[in-house]
Amino acid sequence: MKIAVIGTGYVGLVSGACFAKMGNSVICVDVDSKKIEALKNGVVPIYEPGLADIVSECYKNGSLKFSTQITEALEHADVLFIAVGTPMGADGQADLKYVLSVAKSIGENLNKPLIVVDKSTVPVGTGAKVHEVIEAELKKRNLDVKFEVVSNPEFLKEGAAVEDFLKPDRVVIGASSEWGFSVMRELYEPFMKNHDRLICMDVKSAEMTKYAANSMLATKISFINEIANICERVGADVNLVRKGIGSDSRIGYSFIYPGCGYGGSCFPKDVEALIHTARQNGFEPELLNAVESRNKAQKRVLFDKIYNFFGGDLKGKTIAFWGLAFKPNTDDMREASSLTLIKLLDEAGAKVVAYDPKASEEAKKYMPNLDVKYAKNKYDALNGADAMVLVTEWSEFRSPDFMEIKERLKNAVIFDGRNQYNAKALAEHGFKYFQIGVKA
């Protein structure tokens, strides 16, 4: 099938590359000419396991092309995916200016039947707005061209996006006609060889499904962090509590890992957008409000532990960071917990030396005015530091040489924001070890 993807960010590039890998003819379009030139030269702007190899392979065999011209995409495509950003506005509402700009360009240049697919995460009712914009532009040109706007939200996990796309646990399609459903069924059929995981519904329900899914996952994270805070105060161990509740099949273990808060491009933005949607429609979402406020508070928890340990005086202290990205296997720094913690430490007069396997360069863009030094490896970050903080649970941090850590640190102190280590073993090594949800 001939496919166009507008936007070469995280969602757009993964989608375009994976569709090309499955034998489709794909053209990815972006207004950023530097990004397009970089992609043509084999430089992938985001880190995602397996993505660079697919982009390189498909570009070389001609199944994947890159362009800055939407007219080229419209001449090519039977199906066009809108995968541009929907940043959060000052009021918490998703900003649709990029989505609607693409819709306007489609209407201005469309000359043949087309399925337009909203792949971006958009508020309920966006599909109708996109349809209106395209239709209005076609009327200005006195054209009656067949098109349909379909919703096909993405459910990709950063760090496992390629595998998620190629082996989806479900594909949600929101359409308004059998034409839309049939085209999307044909497109996704190669991904459904073992099980039919296509779920068809109306457009608004598909749009809502994305927000509901992310908000549910965020709720689980905030819930276990709430429990963790209670555990610390009553003397319980949240790690054991997690096992006790996770073994219940009705609950499960997914997303009930206590930590220093969720981040990334999806959960914070989508929870806030759903809160805004609810309020716009006369409903106060008390549970979602609590999910959001708990997460904001959770991002301070590690700072409070560090601050209290040093008696409220952090001036001149050096804190070593292991991990900066909002989660492992990505270089994404959007809404990362490390950003909140580093800012608080900086305000308190502390210095930071950080190491992340993939996100250090990206982190520099988010903290241009903060005095953060970046180490070349995890052990070098520790040299002479007053304490170590683990923020991102990269696999290379799982089984470190604790004697090496102890020798390099000024004080044998670890603040663990992801509860990765064995407290008893660390105590035997002479460490003071602080976790989330466990009284020190």
Stretches found by the model and what they are:
Residues 1-440:
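Structural/interface elements that position substrates and couple domains in central-metabolism enzymes
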